[in-house]
């Protein structure tokens, strides 16, 4: 069975390619490399001993998509391709709406035309409204997003669920991720953000390796045990395995289903700093700065539905996440730039 992975050279995409290949699937990737490095796919091949068929290009390129579907017998699509920086989306809303919505529209048009109607979408916990009680369930309120990135994920969910409602041949799975961190235990692939990292863990590892002076902790006056923001951090390998479980589900089902992929456990920023220091025997200097607008005090998942329906559960703990993140960064101080 051949799975098309859009954005497959990226952080979560590359880890998912490893798990798909290890589970016996063939993998075809399209990626425009705007936020990824092609070395990641070479390393995926080295880890698995299997080949990835790679097309460099944009998912909005309809002719290229038609070529990919003509040359490969694609059974299902995992759709990662998209811009993903919250702050950047506020500064460049048009670019985010154009990229993140039109990739989905062009992709589903071609999929409909060729009769491949099975898609897994990489959504996000950002689709949930800020006024929900914790933990977040798939039935918690969505919408009223605080930034264009969140809105693009919300709108894409609406597009895909609408398609599945109108055409009963479609099978759609929407995976709402919480906060992926960590790296493959080999240290060969990991998170390699362009420029200043937007997420906690890559910033933390870059401080630890000496690329940045200190970590900025945004706010210590939240209504949380230590005053810093609490999030549901999930190991990227667990997340990738969730996609393999979703593939098994999507090829046998119809309609549209939503699943949270998280651990159900919330850790604060300072919890993360201290756990990282302890797991790796390094010091991470940090400073407390003002809150970031739009940040919630607490956000964590109820992942019970994923376990019940997909048979998937996160297995790796906080120490694993911290150790594997540092293993990747210390072996690759400049990321894929080495």
Show which residues each predicted segment covers.
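Short, contiguous strand/loop micro-motifs
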Residues: 2-4, 94-95, 147, 191, ...
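Hydrophobic, Gly/Ser/Ala-rich alpha-helical and linker tracts in large acyl-processing enzymes
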Residues: 184-197, 204-207, 213
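Short-chain dehydrogenase/reductase
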Residues: 97, 146-154, 190, 194-198, ...
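Pocket-edge positions in alpha/beta enzyme catalytic cores
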Residues: 57, 69, 96, 144, ...
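Short, basic/glycine-rich phosphate-binding loops at helix/coil junctions
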Residues: 182-184, 221-222
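C-terminal substrate-binding subdomain of Rossmann-fold SDR/epimerase-dehydratase oxidoreductases
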Residues: 200-338
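N-terminal Rossmann-like NAD(P)+-binding domain of SDR-like oxidoreductases, especially those catalyzing
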Residues: 1-183
